[in-house]
C-alpha cells in the first residue's frame, strides 16, 4: 500500500506542536512539542518508537530553529520517514468567511490567512511563519502543503446564528460576525459520535463540548454546525482558563471610564487574567479547581460559574435541534478528564433527560471514552478528540 505519511504542524505564538501520522490508519510515528520560543529556556520534546526525548533549542530559538531541529536531528534518526512524507498539514485558527474547507496552500491562500490576522492576531502570524519554514525545509513538498481551518466547519451556520445585532454595514464592510473555533475537533467528535450511535452523519443531532484551556460548544443538526459559542474571536462564550467568555459589553466602558483602565489593559484582563484564573485568583488549571472543590471557596466559586455557563449553552442549543437531541459529547483536556465538570453540568440538565452514571463517568478519563449516563438517560458521551488525524486526512486527500 502506498505511503500516506503526513507531517502535521500546529504553530502557536510561542510553541510548535508536530506529528507524523499515517493518514490511512491513524498510526502516529512521531509526536512532539517545541515551546518557550524567544526565551532562554526554549526546548523541544518528542516521542518516537515509544521513547521520549528532550533537547534544548538554544536561547531565543523560535519556529525556524524548531523546524530545522525536527528535520536535521529528529528525522535524521529515521530518514525513511522523511522519504515517505507525502504532505504537510497546517492547523490554521482563522480562515474568515472565505475558507469553507481545507485548501492546498498557494500565494492566494497565504493572502487569505494574512487577511484574517485581525481576528486571530496571536495565531495566524505564527501559522504563516510555520508555512514559510515548512516550504523552506521541505522543498520537495512545495505543492503539498495544506491549510486546515478551525473556522471552516462553522461556515454552515445560518445568518441568524452568525450575525450580531449591530449595524449590518459592519458585517458587509468589515466582516464582523461570529466565526467560531475548534471546528476541526467539533467535526471529528461529531463523526465519531455518528459511528457510536449507528446513525448516518446527515441525520445526527448532537451538541459537542470542546473543553480545554479554551472552550466552545457547537450545535450540530443533521451533521452540520448551526451555532457555536465562540464569536468573532475566541473570547466569546464559555468560562475558559484565562478568558472571561460572555460578559456585558458595557463592562468594558465601565473599566475604562470609572476605573481608568486602558484598552490594552482591558484586553489583557479579559483574555489573560479572567476565566478560572480570575475566579480563583490562583490558577487557570481546572485540576486545582476540581481537587479543591469541597474545601476551598475559590475553587467552588470557579467550578460553579464554569458549570452554570456550560449548562446554559447546552440547554439553549437544545432549542436548535428541531425536537431531537441524540447526545451531548464531551472532548478536549477538561471534557475528557474532568468528571466533576461533566457531572455538575449534566445535573443541571435533568429536564433534557440526562442522568449521570457516577461509575461510568469516573471510568471515562485519561484516554478512555464512552457513555457516561445511565441506560435510561439521554446519552452523554466522552470522545477523545484527534484534530491531528483530521488534519492529516485532509492533507492526504487534497494532495492525492
Curated annotation (Swiss-Prot):
It comes from the Bacteria. ATP binds at residues 17, 210-214, 285-287, 333-337. Its main location: cytoplasm. Belongs to the acetokinase family. The record marks 182, 243 as: Transition state stabilizer. Gene3D superfamilies: 3.30.420.40. This is Acetate kinase. Pfam families: Acetate_kinase (PF00871). It comes from Sodalis glossinidius (strain morsitans). The gene is ackA.
